[in-house]
């Protein structure tokens, strides 16, 4: 039976629950509600409260569009609303009871930044209790998505969704000791857009010193928009709303109307992915809302700053799933409809960019892919190319840049590949998440439908333990990555280290991505 658990923070007292050796605090505010005068602006400090604040239910999720059919599963967003800048904390009962200074340095802390194409996401989809079970303080954060988080109009404000993440990490720095955590031993980890966000956080001055380690799952440091492309999206949104092209005018639009306009804009992008109209970076990624190189929050391309030494003191794990992008082609039905003509052509394939749009020498590259994937359908080949462009090659580039820069700091760089194939689907995007959280049973809230029957618990044991070990000591249990060997841990029913997996595939993208 759950009991009350109480903790005092800088802003006030929280009442959560305690059960099975874990204390849980839900819906904890880390910034003021981004409503009214604060809408579409950077996060503002929480106003302290008196008395005891209830922290037994999930807080609001950020306003967001309906998940696309390509999500492939029910997205549990909980209650979407304005008071959305909140987070959840799971901590071992002993550590939380002891408060600051547990042992000599407190418990390791892991902060999860969720994915969702910078359009959807909710803390209600993730359960961190098994990290707490294993001696880690786990935090899952909300942050603004879509236009609420990434509207850009070149008006002095940008990347407020990214600044939400920074504000949450500052809250962790200032308060996590009250939950038994060590603010000097924080690991950020995230998947997809969450991992892409971490790639940016590694590079920007405002996040420096807020985390010691980072894990990037199927996302790296390449998905950002140039200011010109992002401004074009922002002004197109204002035109669709019929309001002046100012932040104040868009902020005055009711939430539902703004979300409807975002859906219409995305539908137009998918139906007519013209680079001349939208910009190449938007069309190639199919994501109109992304972090923006504004010259302030993001001074320049994150991968370039990392290559120059930003984040070189941070230990990192970087990884991808073998068939990441196949998920989106399979569940939309496009996978079975791709033709050889479409694969070799220059036109969009039902909204998905063809290989030619990525700068590949199409004929030679497709010959190489066919040779190494005998029997692959045109859809399989498109999935392989898009997996490389979206996540695998950016992950390799990030590992190369970080490992080179970290030679002078001693920080570790580690690479993994998640290779377990779900029945009838493959080792697709997001499939690793319930293994990392060790929630293959009824707690696999978001990604459980992808797993099929009887997913291997031994794989969850291995991945979860590696993540906990890395957060605790900086060592996940396999050799570090360096360009000479490119050691990569391959996670399947059994695990083994492979040097430079699919080197031929990497070679196709030299000088391109």
Question: Residue ranges of each PLM-predicted region?
Answer:
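Non-catalytic accessory segments of hydrolases
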Residues: 1-159, 183, 285, 322, ...
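Alpha/beta-hydrolase active-site loop
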Residues: 84, 157-177
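Alpha/beta-hydrolase fold nucleophile elbow
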Residues: 108, 179-191
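Substrate-access "cap/lid" subdomains that shape
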Residues: 208, 217-345, 382-401
């Amino acid at each position: 039976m759950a009991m009350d658990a109480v903790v005092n923070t800088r802003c006030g007292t929280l009442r959560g629950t305690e059960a099975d050796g874990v204390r849980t605090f839900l819906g904890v505010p880390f910034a003021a509600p981004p409503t009214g005068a604060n809408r579409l602006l950077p996060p503002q400090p929480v106003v302290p409260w008196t008395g005891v604040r209830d922290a037994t239910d999930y807080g609001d999720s950020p306003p967001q569009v309906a998940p696309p059919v390509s999500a492939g599963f029910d997205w549990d967003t909980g209650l979407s609303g304005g008071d959305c800048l909140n987070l959840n904390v799971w901590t071992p009962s002993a550590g939380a009871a002891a408060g600051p200074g547990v042992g000599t340095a407190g418990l390791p802390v892991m902060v999860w930044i969720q994915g969702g194409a910078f359009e959807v996401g909710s803390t209600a989809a993730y359960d961190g209790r098994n990290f707490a079970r294993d001696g880690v303080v786990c935090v899952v954060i909300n942050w603004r998505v879509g236009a609420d988080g990434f509207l850009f109009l070149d008006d002095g404000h940008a990347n407020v969704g990214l600044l939400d993440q920074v504000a949450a990490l500052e809250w962790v720095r200032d308060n996590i000791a009250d939950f038994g955590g060590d603010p000097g031993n924080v690991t950020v980890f995230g998947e997809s857009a969450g991992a892409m966000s971490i790639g940016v956080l590694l590079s920007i001055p405002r996040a420096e010193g807020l985390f010691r380690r980072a894990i990037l799952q199927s996302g790296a440091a390449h998905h950002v928009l140039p200011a010109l492309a992002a401004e074009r999206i922002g002004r197109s949104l204002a035109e669709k709303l019929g309001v002046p092209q100012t932040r104040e005018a868009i902020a005055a639009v009711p939430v539902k109307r703004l979300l409807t306009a975002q859906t219409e804009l995305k539908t137009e992008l998918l139906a007519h992915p013209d680079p001349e109209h939208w910009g190449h970076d938007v069309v190639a990624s199919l994501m109109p809302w992304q972090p923006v190189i504004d010259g302030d929050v993001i001074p320049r391309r994150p991968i370039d700053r990392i290559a120059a030494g930003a984040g070189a003191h941070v230990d990192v794990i970087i990884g991808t799933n073998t068939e990441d992008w196949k998920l989106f082609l399979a569940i939309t039905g496009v996978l079975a409809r791709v033709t050889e003509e479409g694969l070799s052509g220059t036109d969009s394939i039902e909204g998905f960019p063809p290989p030619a749009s990525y700068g590949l020498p199409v004929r030679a590259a497709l010959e190489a892919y066919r040779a190494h994937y005998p029997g692959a359908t045109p859809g399989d080949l498109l999935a392989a190319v898009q997996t490389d462009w979206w996540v695998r090659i950016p992950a390799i580039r990030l590992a190369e840049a970080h490992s080179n820069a970290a030679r002078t700091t001693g920080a570790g760089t580690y690479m993994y590949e998640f290779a377990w194939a779900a029945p009838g689907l493959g080792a697709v995007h997001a499939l690793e998440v319930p293994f990392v959280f060790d929630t293959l049973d009824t707690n696999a809230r978001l990604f459980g439908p992808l797993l099929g029957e009887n997913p291997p618990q031994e794989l969850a044991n291995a991945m979860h333990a590696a993540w906990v070990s890395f957060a605790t000591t900086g060592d996940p249990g396999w050799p570090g990555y360096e360009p000479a060997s490119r050691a990569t841990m391959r996670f399947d029913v059994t695990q083994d280290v492979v040097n430079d997996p699919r080197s031929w595939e990497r070679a196709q993208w030299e000088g391109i991505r």
